[in-house]
Amino acid sequence: MSELLFMGAASGSAVGDENLGPRRYMLALTNTDRVHRERAALSFAEHLAAYAKSHSEAMADKGFIYHSTGPPATNCARRSKATKWQLGGENVGVGGSLESLEDAFMASDPHRKNILRRVYDHAAVGIARADDRIWITVIFYG
């Protein structure tokens, strides 16, 4: 699992394509990077999106990024058994736009590995906004 902090100026849209919604727009950005590198596109894991969002909200409330641990992660692990995960990963970050966050993830080796790992076939995206910044949790599994 990896974490990332980028707070540079926003580039492009701060909330993503309004037609997709910000969570699905972030997944579209991730899938574009995957497909350009001959990986299969990820499906949106709606059943974990609320958990990912609650983690993003908790990070925004505390003012720093961290990986999910403790009871929520235990709950996530229980869900993983129900969905038959073999492997899971998580990218967390804070920044000015979804595009800049995806660019930062791809520029960081551990985050890029999570995005491009071939075994992953699903991802959940949780987004919170606070103080003109976007806090994000992306959970990958396959």
Question: What are the functions of these language-model segments?
Answer:
Residues M1-G142:
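Functional surface patches built around histidine and acidic residues
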